């Protein structure tokens, strides 16, 4: 075999090897993404004490009715599925009863409430309920809560990748921080964050509302602190 033929054989084998590596790399990428999503879906929503850290600030002209400021009760509801909270928010009678302390809480894992006064700021540490994946914040503005008075948030997960070539992913629920501002007639700002510097954090299926910061994320967005 002359040098030219030998060169052609080596070149052809090199090209074949390159194609195999590219195909293998693509397959690995897809498999890695699937492992990542699987880790998110299989994360166990365990109970955690003080895992929801809520900072609420009310303006002095809070919940104005007949030109007078009023108190405003905040309900904090936790559920396993978002549709369970959506169903609650779509039922004005049930909401009214919950604010009155007489409503049933079927499918709601935990319900907390706090009465905010005009001009008040408060920090609350709330336990994360076992099986909870979503939280709803409902402000009791007059005459009744609507979509400008509510926020539904997914509880955050921290992702970690293990290994390099055949990597594995793990995900665990982590504490979250929420800053809520109650305006004259509606919630005017809601920021949420989680994790520490360098963490990869996701809020699965999160919907962004007007008034949230860019740090809040969007559908399955990744936050790097």
Ranges and model annotations:
Residues 43-47, 61-69:
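Short, solvent-exposed beta-strand/turn "edge" segments of beta-rich domains on protein surfaces
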Residues 2-15:
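Bacterial N-terminal signal peptides that target proteins for export
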Residues 22-25:
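C-terminal motif of bacterial Sec signal peptides marking the signal peptidase cleavage site
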């Amino acid at each position: 075999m002359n040098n030219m033929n030998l060169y052609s054989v080596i070149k052809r084998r090199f090209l074949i090897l390159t194609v195999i590596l590219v195909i293998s790399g693509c397959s690995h990428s897809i498999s890695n993404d699937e492992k990542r999503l699987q880790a998110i879906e299989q994360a166990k929503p365990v109970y955690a004490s003080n895992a929801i850290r809520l900072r609420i600030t009310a303006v002095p002209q809070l919940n104005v009715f007949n030109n007078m400021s009023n108190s405003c009760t905040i309900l904090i509801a936790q559920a396993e599925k978002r549709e369970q909270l959506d169903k609650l928010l779509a039922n004005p009678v049930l909401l009214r009863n919950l604010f009155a302390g007489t409503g049933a809480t079927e499918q709601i894992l935990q319900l907390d409430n706090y009465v905010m006064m005009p001009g008040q700021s408060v920090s609350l540490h709330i336990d994360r309920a076992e099986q909870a994946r979503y939280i709803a914040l409902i402000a009791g503005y007059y005459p009744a809560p609507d979509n400008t008075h509510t926020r539904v948030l997914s509880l955050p997960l921290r992702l970690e990748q293990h290994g390099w070539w055949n990597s594995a992913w793990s995900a665990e629920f982590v504490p979250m921080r929420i800053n809520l501002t109650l305006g004259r007639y509606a919630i005017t700002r809601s920021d949420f964050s989680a994790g520490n510097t360098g963490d990869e954090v996701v809020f699965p299926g999160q919907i962004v509302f007007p008034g949230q910061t860019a740090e809040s994320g969007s559908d399955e967005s990744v936050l790097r602190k």
